[in-house]
Structure formats: structure tokens, C-alpha cells
């Protein structure tokens, strides 16, 4: 086997929430370029949009990140169902970047998702996330911060995600669903209430990938242990 270093979940400067980078794009890129072992694949992550992916791709196209062989978009969501820690379940959509029009197709698909607030529907795109943020903040907020507020409030339903996949052949063929398995913001946070058992199974069945750094969780999903070993 030949091991390659991937980072499938990397936020970048300008990410809509919890942006700890500021505008230091050069520092961000240099950290990746100088990493050892070399990082060959990056999943550029943002909440509800692919703006950070587009920015990193533009840097790559301009000659930065020469050792990175593949960059793909990772769109992060919080689901409407919450764990016992009161955190929305963390779900990611990992898109294939092979098609030349993948950006347009992804943004079209994301705009099919909506969140209802005070009897109004807000679509999953930058303009309507800003409108949601302003509505939640009573309007007294600039567009940039409003987008962050809107992204923080927007939650997605499992039924809406299923509908998006069902109605969009390109998404079905070019997107993997990943879900966190942690107690904090993952499906393990639903195991303490038996009434959520079926929903937990539905979410995990919908996913293609389970994100976890826990050795017991890894062994369970690799079929090396039983659910009793997770307790």
C-alpha cells in the first residue's frame, strides 16, 4: 500500500462561521505548501456554500499549492435534529470536481434546499443566507455578518436532502454524504434517547462516509466489533 496524506475537512479564510484565519491567505497557503508529509488532497470546507473552495481553486489555478493533486468541495451543514448536547447533527456533502461545470451544478443543487423562518422560505445561497441573517437580526446588520448569522441559523432536513438527491442525477453520481459519529455533534449523540434510534439509523444509512477519530467507532464501522463495544 502507498499511503497519501489527505485533509478532507479544511476550512479556509472567509469561511462563513468560526473564521479564525482573517485575511491571511498567504499564511494559509504556505502552511499547506510546507506541510510534511506533503498534503496531496484537500476537501475545502465551508458552511452551506462553496465560496472557500472557489477561492482556493483560483489560488491553485494561479500556481499555488503545486504539490496538491486534488481539491474538492466539502459543504458542511447542521441538521434540524439535535444531539443531547443541543448540537445539530453535523453532515457534509463531498462533491467531485471533475466536470467543468461542477461549480454551477453544485450551486444549483444547494439552492434547492430551503429553511423556513417566520413563515418565509430562505434558499441555501449567499444572497438568501444574508436575508435570513437580517431577518433573524431584525435587519440592523451588514451583508457580510448577515451571511454568517444566516449560515449559523440555517438547518437542513434529512427529507430535503433525500429529495435533492432523488431529483438531481448529477448530485447522485457526483456527491458523497459524510456524517459525524461523535457524541457532541454526531449521530452517537442520539443514542441516549431510544426514541431517536430509528432516526439515527436513517441518517447513518443515508451517509456514504462516517467521520470519526474514535478507534472504537472506526472498528465498528469496519465490521470489526459490535455495537456493544461502543458503550
Predicted segments — roles?
Residues 212-217:
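His/Asp/Glu-enriched short active-site or ligand-binding loop at hydrolase and phosphoryl-transfer sites
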Residues 222-223:
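Extended non-globular interaction regions in eukaryotic gene-expression and organellar proteins
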Residues 1, 7, 180, 226-227:
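C-terminal regulatory/interaction regions
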Residues 231:
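Eukaryote-biased recognition of electropositive, low-complexity segments
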Residues 1-88:
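An N-terminally biased module of ancient metal coordination in phosphate/nucleic-acid-related enzymes
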Residues 1, 55-211:
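Extended substrate/RNA-proximal surfaces in nucleic-acid metabolism proteins
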Amino acid at each position: 500500500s502507498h499511503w497519501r496524506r489527505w485533509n478532507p475537512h479544511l476550512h479556509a479564510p472567509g469561511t462563513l462561521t468560526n473564521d479564525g484565519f482573517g485575511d491571511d491567505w498567504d499564511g494559509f497557503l504556505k502552511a499547506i505548501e510546507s506541510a510534511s508529509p506533503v498534503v496531496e488532497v484537500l476537501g475545502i470546507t465551508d458552511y452551506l456554500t462553496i465560496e472557500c473552495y472557489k477561492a482556493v481553486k483560483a489560488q491553485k489555478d494561479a500556481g499555488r499549492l503545486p504539490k496538491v493533486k486534488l481539491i474538492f468541495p466539502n459543504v458542511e451543514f447542521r441538521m434540524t435534529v439535535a444531539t443531547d448536547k443541543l448540537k445539530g447533527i453535523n453532515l457534509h456533502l463531498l462533491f467531485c470536481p471533475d466536470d467543468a461545470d461542477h461549480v454551477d451544478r453544485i450551486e444549483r443543487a444547494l439552492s434547492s434546499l430551503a429553511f423556513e423562518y417566520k413563515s418565509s422560505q430562505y434558499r441555501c445561497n449567499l444572497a438568501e443566507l444574508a436575508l435570513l441573517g437580517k431577518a433573524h437580526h431584525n435587519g440592523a446588520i451588514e451583508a457580510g455578518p448577515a451571511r454568517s448569522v444566516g449560515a449559523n441559523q440555517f438547518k437542513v432536513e434529512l427529507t430535503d436532502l433525500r429529495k435533492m438527491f432523488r431529483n438531481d442525477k448529477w448530485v447522485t453520481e457526483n456527491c458523497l454524504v459524510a456524517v459525524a459519529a461523535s457524541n457532541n455533534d454526531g449521530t452517537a449523540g442520539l443514542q441516549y434517547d431510544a426514541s431517536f434510534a430509528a432516526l439515527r439509523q436513517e441518517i447513518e444509512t443515508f451517509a456514504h462516509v462516517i467521520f470519526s477519530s474514535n478507534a472504537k467507532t472506526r472498528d465498528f464501522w469496519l465490521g470489526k466489533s459490535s455495537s456493544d463495544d461502543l458503550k
